A protein has these predicted regions:
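Non-Sec secretion/translocation targeting segments of pathogen effectors
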Residues: 129-132
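Negatively charged, low-complexity tracts enriched in Asp/Glu with abundant Ser/Thr
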Residues: 2-25
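Acidic, low-complexity, intrinsically disordered interaction modules
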Residues: 31-114
Length: 132
Protein backbone atom coordinates (compact mmCIF):
# COMPACT_ATOMS: atom_id res chain seq x y z
CA UNK A 1 0.00 0.00 0.00
CA UNK A 2 1.46 3.35 -0.99
CA UNK A 3 1.36 6.47 1.13
CA UNK A 4 -0.04 9.69 -0.33
CA UNK A 5 0.41 13.13 1.19
CA UNK A 6 -2.70 15.26 1.34
CA UNK A 7 -2.50 18.92 0.43
CA UNK A 8 -4.83 20.43 3.00
CA UNK A 9 -6.89 23.56 2.55
CA UNK A 10 -4.62 25.24 5.10
CA UNK A 11 -1.52 24.40 3.05
CA UNK A 12 -3.21 25.83 -0.03
CA UNK A 13 -4.13 28.97 1.92
CA UNK A 14 -0.49 29.46 2.95
CA UNK A 15 0.75 28.86 -0.58
CA UNK A 16 -1.80 31.33 -1.92
CA UNK A 17 -0.70 34.04 0.52
CA UNK A 18 2.83 33.79 -0.89
CA UNK A 19 1.73 33.60 -4.56
CA UNK A 20 3.14 37.00 -5.57
CA UNK A 21 6.45 36.31 -3.86
CA UNK A 22 6.74 32.86 -5.44
CA UNK A 23 5.91 34.22 -8.88
CA UNK A 24 8.43 37.07 -8.71
CA UNK A 25 11.35 35.28 -7.06
CA UNK A 26 13.55 33.55 -9.65
CA UNK A 27 15.79 31.74 -7.17
CA UNK A 28 13.10 29.51 -5.65
CA UNK A 29 10.25 27.26 -6.66
CA UNK A 30 7.59 25.42 -4.75
CA UNK A 31 6.32 22.09 -6.04
CA UNK A 32 3.79 19.59 -4.78
CA UNK A 33 4.50 15.86 -4.56
CA UNK A 34 1.92 13.31 -3.46
CA UNK A 35 4.83 11.31 -2.05
CA UNK A 36 6.62 13.93 0.09
CA UNK A 37 4.39 17.02 0.25
CA UNK A 38 5.68 20.43 -0.73
CA UNK A 39 9.19 20.57 -2.15
CA UNK A 40 10.92 23.93 -1.76
CA UNK A 41 13.69 24.30 -4.34
CA UNK A 42 16.47 26.84 -4.33
CA UNK A 43 17.67 27.57 -7.84
CA UNK A 44 20.99 28.93 -9.06
CA UNK A 45 20.00 31.94 -11.16
CA UNK A 46 23.10 31.64 -13.36
CA UNK A 47 22.97 27.92 -14.15
CA UNK A 48 19.21 27.45 -13.67
CA UNK A 49 19.91 24.26 -11.74
CA UNK A 50 18.48 23.34 -8.38
CA UNK A 51 20.90 23.81 -5.50
CA UNK A 52 18.91 22.38 -2.62
CA UNK A 53 15.46 21.20 -1.67
CA UNK A 54 13.44 20.98 1.51
CA UNK A 55 10.44 18.73 2.07
CA UNK A 56 7.64 20.55 3.89
CA UNK A 57 4.81 18.48 5.34
CA UNK A 58 2.68 21.00 7.23
CA UNK A 59 1.24 24.45 6.65
CA UNK A 60 3.37 25.78 9.51
CA UNK A 61 6.58 24.37 8.02
CA UNK A 62 5.63 25.85 4.66
CA UNK A 63 4.91 29.28 6.10
CA UNK A 64 8.10 29.30 8.21
CA UNK A 65 10.27 28.32 5.23
CA UNK A 66 8.76 30.96 2.96
CA UNK A 67 8.99 33.72 5.59
CA UNK A 68 12.60 32.76 6.18
CA UNK A 69 13.34 32.93 2.46
CA UNK A 70 11.68 36.33 2.20
CA UNK A 71 13.97 37.58 4.97
CA UNK A 72 17.02 36.24 3.15
CA UNK A 73 15.86 37.96 -0.05
CA UNK A 74 15.55 41.29 1.78
CA UNK A 75 19.07 40.90 3.16
CA UNK A 76 20.48 40.09 -0.27
CA UNK A 77 18.91 43.29 -1.57
CA UNK A 78 20.88 45.32 0.99
CA UNK A 79 24.11 44.07 -0.64
CA UNK A 80 25.89 44.08 2.71
CA UNK A 81 27.22 40.56 2.16
CA UNK A 82 26.11 38.92 5.35
CA UNK A 83 23.65 36.25 6.30
CA UNK A 84 20.30 36.37 8.01
CA UNK A 85 21.67 36.04 11.52
CA UNK A 86 23.80 39.20 11.13
CA UNK A 87 21.02 41.67 10.32
CA UNK A 88 20.78 45.02 12.07
CA UNK A 89 17.69 46.94 13.30
CA UNK A 90 17.08 48.64 9.94
CA UNK A 91 17.23 45.32 8.11
CA UNK A 92 14.89 43.72 10.65
CA UNK A 93 12.41 46.55 9.96
CA UNK A 94 12.74 45.94 6.21
CA UNK A 95 12.12 42.24 6.73
CA UNK A 96 8.98 42.97 8.78
CA UNK A 97 7.76 45.34 6.02
CA UNK A 98 8.26 42.60 3.42
CA UNK A 99 6.36 40.13 5.58
CA UNK A 100 3.44 42.49 6.24
CA UNK A 101 1.31 41.72 3.13
CA UNK A 102 1.61 37.99 3.77
CA UNK A 103 0.86 38.23 7.49
CA UNK A 104 -2.19 40.37 6.76
CA UNK A 105 -3.51 37.32 4.87
CA UNK A 106 -2.22 34.84 7.46
CA UNK A 107 -2.51 36.59 10.85
CA UNK A 108 -2.53 33.27 12.70
CA UNK A 109 1.07 32.75 11.55
CA UNK A 110 2.37 36.14 12.76
CA UNK A 111 4.10 34.40 15.65
CA UNK A 112 6.49 32.81 13.14
CA UNK A 113 7.88 36.24 12.27
CA UNK A 114 8.77 36.88 15.89
CA UNK A 115 10.17 33.36 16.16
CA UNK A 116 12.43 33.82 13.12
CA UNK A 117 13.73 37.18 14.35
CA UNK A 118 14.16 35.83 17.89
CA UNK A 119 16.21 32.92 16.56
CA UNK A 120 18.38 35.39 14.64
CA UNK A 121 18.74 37.58 17.72
CA UNK A 122 19.67 34.65 19.94
CA UNK A 123 22.34 33.68 17.44
CA UNK A 124 23.68 37.22 17.38
CA UNK A 125 23.62 38.05 21.09
CA UNK A 126 26.90 36.20 21.24
CA UNK A 127 28.29 38.75 18.75
CA UNK A 128 26.86 41.87 20.43
CA UNK A 129 24.20 42.82 17.85
CA UNK A 130 20.80 44.05 19.07
CA UNK A 131 17.81 43.68 16.71
CA UNK A 132 15.22 45.30 19.01
Amino acid sequence: MSFKMKRTLEMRRVESAFADYLENEDSIDLLWSDKVGYVFLTINEKTHESESCDDLHTATQLCHRLLDDMAITVLLQTKRNHNFTNMDKDEAARVRAAWKPVIEKLPDYAYLCDEILREAQENEEENGIDLQ
